[in-house]
Every structure is written in structure tokens, then in C-alpha cells.
Regions:
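Glycine-enriched alpha-helix->loop->beta-strand junction motifs that scaffold or abut catalytic
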Residues: 42, 129, 201-203, 229-235
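Non-cysteine beta-strand/loop elements that form the S-adenosyl-L-methionine
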Residues: 5-12, 83-89, 112, 133, ...
Length: 344
């Protein structure tokens, strides 16, 4: 914990550099190796996909899944860490080629729900009630291929089944406007929280905001954070960065736009995010060109930048800023922010 915040990271955040145009550039690392790195860097928690906890999950019985989850719990405990989230990885399987909860094929929808319930069971074994739904394939390549209204109903139906499965589970929807789909059904936190209201227990359905996803939607991540926190529903956070409307870049936090990063920290500070107990996670990836020996630097650098920006946010002269606001002197306010970020 630094500056009062708890930090989390996922095993997929140490990746091998493959992109759609070329193969991997770094060797894969084992989970144990990654866990050692997380701990040494001062991370408090680990984010998991269901199959990060239980590899080849689809071929395993419910009992075997729980057993392997208990083994992971022990491993985490020995490292002095905890599981922050578990997320069903619903975008890899041949069953979910055309969507998971919103697939046109009822068998695919059933697969997605069954797998989500197993994810909740894994969470229970890990002592982790927060289930994240990144709705990767809940959208279309072709709008005429699905019915948008029906898709909302199907997502609500799926979430309701999860809520009924375990009364402790909380569902955090991670919105993203596109990629892998052309258009996604839950593109912003506003959409996620609106869907929450349709569910059987809206109090247990909230959101996870990712910087890059907000930017891909043409929105300011700080406003998205303020919006979710006005509802008390920002339950996790994926900080990273994104250079405009391109592919999802997952750059280190603050890498593309330091001022946008600063404003995200200001939003977290004014809303008391640290006090909610929720974690700050860095959903970041190394540049493909990164050498093996630097394969975790993007994460430690993100944490460093975060802590430095918390200091910048706390030392910002709010009184002077408010005076300029009252005087409608936004020119001076603009320069004040720039000079504060530049430092003395
Ligand atoms: C991809 C998402 C992805 C999720 C993760 C947790 O764009 O950000 O990394 O956060 O799979 O569900
Ligand atoms: Mg993410």
C-alpha cells in the first residue's frame, strides 16, 4: 500500500508481445514467477481470469475446480496477497465465437452462464466476492446480426442468474466500446450502471472503469470515475493509457497524457476512492519491443507515476484554483495546472 491505495495486477499483464501481425517476442513466464514479481513490486492483490486459477477449466468438474481454487488461495496467502477479482474469460472458447450471453445460439448462452457460475465458485474459494464482466464479445461485427434490445435482456438474465447463484457475489461490469467487436453493447459506465438497475439486486451490480476504454469511447476517464462514484459503484479500476482512437493500447499509466492521468487521480481523491477499500489495478502491457529483462517495468512504472501524481494532486493549491474559477479566469487556471505538473 502506498499513499493509502491498494494495488492489484493480473497475470496477463506480463505478456509475450504477440500482436495480430507478428508472433511473441518474449518467453512466457510461470504464474509463480509472476507472483514473485508482483509481491516484490509491492502489489497487494492479484486479478484473475477463471482459467488463470484453473487452467483448462472447461474439461474439469465443479469439485476439481474448487480444489484448484483452494490451492491458489493457499499460494496467495503464503505470498501475503489476496485475490481482488475473478473474471470469466468468455472470449476464447469455440462456444463464444458469436458472443457469450448475447449469442444467437442458446447452447452458447448456456455455456457462458455455466462458466460464469463456476467463476463465482472460484471467487468463493478465494474469498473474493467481486466478479468482473468484461463483455468482450457482447456486441456485433454486423448490427443486423443481433437485436440490441434482446441483447440487453439477455445480459440482465445472465447477471440475475449469477446474483441468484451466490448471495455474496457482486458483479462489476467493465465497459468498453469496441475491440474485439465493431460495436459493444455496454460501451460506457453509464450503460453499465443503467443495466444494473434492471437486475434483480441492483445494489450488487456496479462497475469497473478502464482508462483506455473511456478514451476509446471519446470520453474523459476522470468524468467516468466521478459518474460511477456518484452512484457509489466504482468497485475497481484499470488504470493505463491510450493514444487516441486506435487499437486498445494498454500503455503505462500517464504514458500518453499526463494531464488526463492527473485528472483521474484528482477524481479518485475527491471521491475518497482509497477509503472505499477498492483496489487500483494497472491493466497495462509492455510494448512489443520490450526486452525480456524489462518485461514488468510497465507495471512498476505505472505504480511510480500513480504515486507521484497523488502527490501532485494533494499539493495542488485548491484555494488558488477556486479563486481563478470564481473569477472565470480559466486561462490562468489552465497555466496553473500545466506549471504544477511541470514542477518547480
Ligand atoms: C481488455 C480488458 C481486459 C479485462 C480483463 C478482466 O480490453 O481490459 O484486460 O480487463 O480481461 O476481465
Ligand atoms: Mg481492463
Amino acid at each position: 500500500m502506498q499513499a493509502g491505495y491498494r494495488f492489484s495486477i493480473g497475470p496477463w499483464n506480463i505478456s509475450e508481445g504477440a500482436d495480430p501481425y507478428g508472433p511473441t517476442t518474449r518467453a512466457p513466464k510461470s504464474f509463480d514467477w509472476k507472483l514473485g514479481k508482483f509481491k516484490a513490486a509491492g502489489f497487494d492483490a492479484v486479478m484473475f481470469h477463471d482459467d488463470d486459477v484453473v487452467p483448462d477449466i472447461d474439461g474439469k468438474s465443479a469439485e476439481q475446480i474448487k480444489k484448484e481454487a483452494r490451492e491458489m488461495k493457499k499460494k496467495l496467502g503464503d505470498a501475503g496477497m489476496f485475490a481482488e477479482i475473478v473474471a470469466p474469460r468468455l472470449w476464447f472458447s469455440p462456444n463464444t465465437i458469436d458472443g457469450a450471453y448475447t449469442s444467437n445460439d442458446p447452447k452458447a448462452r448456456q455455456y457462458a452462464i455455466d462458466r460464469s457460475l463456476r467463476t463465482i465458485d472460484i471467487g468463493a474459494e478465494l474469498d473474493c466476492d467481486l466478479i468482473v464482466l468484461w463483455l468482450a464479445r457482447e456486441g456485433t461485427y454486423l448490427r443486423e446480426s443481433k437485436d440490441g434490445r434482446r441483447s440487453v435482456e439477455l445480459i440482465v438474465e445472465a447477471v440475475d442468474k449469477m446474483l441468484a447463484h451466490n448471495p455474496k457475489a457482486r458483479i462489476a461490469i467493465e465497459p468498453k466500446p469496441n475491440e474485439p467487436m465493431d460495436h459493444a453493447y455496454i460501451p460506457t459506465i453509464g450503460h453499465a450502471l443503467a443495466v444494473a438497475q434492471l437486475c434483480s439486486d441492483p445494489k450488487r451490480v456496479g462497475g469497473l472503469i478502464e482508462t483506455a476504454h473511456c478514451i476509446l469511447a471519446g470520453l474523459d476517464p476522470a468524468d467516468e470515475i466521478d459518474f460511477a462514484m456518484a452512484f457509489g459503484k466504482l468497485w475497481s479500476l484499470h488504470l493505463n493509457d491510450q493514444n487516441g482512437l486506435k487499437f486498445d493500447q494498454d500503455k503505462p499509466f500517464g504514458s500518453a497524457n499526463l494531464r488526463v492521468a492527473f485528472n483521474q487521480i484528482r477524481a479518485l481523491e475527491r471521491n475518497g476512492y482509497a477509503k472505499t477499500g477498492a483496489c487500483v489495478a494497472f491493466d497495462v502491457h509492455s510494448f512489443r519491443a520490450t526486452k525480456e529483462e524489462h518485461c514488468f517495468d510497465h507495471a512498476t512504472n505505472s505504480m511510480r507515476t500513480f504515486v507521484k501524481l497523488v502527490e501532485r494532486a494533494r499539493s495542488f493549491d485548491e484555494k488558488a484554483a477556486q479563486k481563478l474559477v470564481a473569477d472565470r479566469n480559466y486561462q490562468a487556471l489552465d497555466q496553473m495546472v500545466i506549471e504544477h505538473l511541470l514542477g518547480k
